[in-house]
């Protein structure tokens, strides 16, 4: 086999392949066996029809066509492996010459396919970004203390009109043109939640127990979803939450601390850690943004179109041109990020340990509210493990970039990102959960890595992957 590759543009190449007739013999033999198993010829058992009879009854051309169809993927893959390119998406094949049914001859074909672009990456130590100063507002400590007091608060009935933050028990009746559509009784609701019916909070404010009011709002569900209905709400009771005093007794009740001062100090530490984490996330986003500004990352249009199509199909909005335009920029930016981090991971020779993959899968399961084993089975069944491997690899590549980049705050002080790079709040998983997933994962020796190259990486590039800047 002879093959050449021509670069059409930074993200697309053309392979030209020539295969000698002798090299097609395994595929020809296979073609005869395939056809013999599909046809019935009098005097021969199924699958035992000799080649000469197949040629006589069905023609040599049919055999060659079957052989060429079998051989094309194999020789295309050999041409890819002989090159330095990683195909992305589906190839376009053109057979320019097929063997002659009588005289034989070579098979010649060409393949155009999108490929991962070759990027010129900078020295990571040349990357410098500035983030906001670390500020710990005292009011956030008070907010956390109030939230803790609310957890230990008690509900007490009040003889006054309902106000924001009160807890009410209500009955609801919805009507359209005098026809009762739906009713509900004894619903507990906190005024100000804003998660039930549009305008409900405003309608309830100022209404006392045993009082009622009527307002108009669109229905949130059912057969008449979106239609305006007349909503009558009757208040059965009004209660307010009485908070315990913030003192040493409360500190002992709500925490492991003996004094309110110790509890406040702990809440202050929590706020400080949260702000450090936010500062670290800002640094991560800015490092990636700086890399994208520095590196020219051409994007294969087929990937953009495939991702947009998949997104619209999931939302059943394939004909929504306006929404297509809305998501195109974000899709293109996400793919640029993926391609850049893939290239960076290659240069830094980053692999993925099985334990790292398991930890990531457990974290994702928690985000989706699923049991780790159930999530792993779902991901494996959908063939999405390779995309998960690539996502972990990209995260590690970005972590390397953050470690080597210079990050300072607005005051010029260096920012320590060790906690974020070494593991985030989202990465903390229980040992039991990790062990559960390990039982479903493929076994690996200590230190063994999951191969992020070849078919795995190609599948990952074609799959929907989250933007690493937002993970």
Curated annotation (Swiss-Prot):
From the UniProt annotation, give the residues forming the signal peptide: none
Domain PPIase FKBP-type positions:
165-244
Q: Which UniProt keywords apply?
A: Cell cycle, Cell division, Chaperone, Cytoplasm, Isomerase, Rotamase
| Parts forming coiled coils | none
What InterPro entries does its record include? PPIase_dom_sf (IPR046357), PPIase_FKBP_dom (IPR001179), Trig_fac (IPR005215), Trigger_fac_C (IPR008880), Trigger_fac_C_sf (IPR037041), Trigger_fac_ribosome-bd_bac (IPR008881), Trigger_fac_ribosome-bd_sf (IPR036611), Trigger_fact/SurA_dom_sf (IPR027304)
Enzyme class comes to: isomerase
Q: Name one GO molecular function term.
A: protein folding chaperone
Write out the GO biological process terms. Answer: 'de novo' cotranslational protein folding; cell division; chaperone-mediated protein folding; protein transport; protein unfolding
Q: Which reaction does it catalyse?
A: [protein]-peptidylproline (omega=180) = [protein]-peptidylproline (omega=0)
Subcellular localization, per the record? Cytoplasm
Q: Where are the transmembrane segments?
A: none
Q: Which SUPFAM superfamilies match?
A: FKBP-like, Triger factor/SurA peptide-binding domain-like, Trigger factor ribosome-binding domain
Region spans: Disordered: 407-471
Annotated Acidic residues bias: 416-443
EC number assigned by the record: 5.2.1.8
A GO cellular-component term linked to this record = cytoplasm
| Comment on protein domains | Consists of 3 domains; the N-terminus binds the ribosome, the middle domain has PPIase activity, while the C-terminus has intrinsic chaperone activity on its own.
PANTHER family with a match to the protein in the record: TRIGGER FACTOR CHAPERONE AND PEPTIDYL-PROLYL CIS/TRANS ISOMERASE, TRIGGER FACTOR-LIKE PROTEIN TIG, CHLOROPLASTIC
State the function annotated in the UniProt record: Involved in protein export. Acts as a chaperone by maintaining the newly synthesized protein in an open conformation. Functions as a peptidyl-prolyl cis-trans isomerase.
> Which protein family is it in?
Belongs to the FKBP-type PPIase family. Tig subfamily.
HAMAP family for this protein: Trigger_factor_Tig
* Protein name, per record: Trigger factor
Query: Which species is listed as the source?
Result: Kineococcus radiotolerans (strain ATCC BAA-149 / DSM 14245 / SRS30216)
